[in-house]
Structure formats: C-alpha cells, structure tokens
Amino acid sequence: MAITTTSRKAAAEQFLQLACTDVERAYAQLVAPGFRHHNVYFKGSASALKEGMAENLRQFPQKKLDVKRSLEEGDYVVVMSHVRLEPNTPGYGLMHMFRFEGDRIAELWDVAQEIPANSPNENGPF
C-alpha cells in the first residue's frame, strides 16, 4: 500500500527526530534499499551518512531538533528545522529534501546555516 502525502511528511519528520536519538532505528524503519544522499561531507552511501549521524549523536547527546515547516510535492518532502547541538545555543537552521520511493526515503539532500548569536535580522531565521 502506498504511503499517503500526510504520512510522507510525517515519515520525513520522524526520520529527523529519530536521527537525534536512535540513528539505527531511523534507518531501519524509514530508509529504502539503495538509499543515496548528497551531503558533501560524507561518501554517498547510506552507511557513510549513517555512521556520520551516529558520530554526531555521540558527540552531542543532548541535541534537539524542532521542525518549523514541511512541504510536499509528489515524491518529495522538504523539511525546515532548527537543531541545537547543545542546550542554550543558537544552533543551526536546516533544510532537508527527501525523495521517497513508496513509503521509504530513497534520496536525501541537506543544507545547514549556523545561526549567529547576534543576528542583525529582526525577523529571525524562521
């Protein structure tokens, strides 16, 4: 049975939340065989990104992610979020774009922007 639009967005958000607590479970439950990604800091395989995410979680066990917006079009979901690696820090603004095959994540793109402590923009990053 094909996943619905609403549950695709929920699956993308769930993947990001799980990646902050249980990377292995995030991949087991939500990633498709043959998954590939475009993060420029890691080789393009699922295992390379998964290990990088696991290492980040080991370094920052108090990491928290807050989803700000999710958009969907066809097989694609885009999630804008705010991640704080440690409490009481400005953190990063993130954009993840997921491509789904059925109910699984087949491809992932991501970009991050560090949030300055004293931004001149009164509108904030979100």
Annotated model-derived regions:
Residues 1-126:
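C-terminal and inter-domain tail/linker signature
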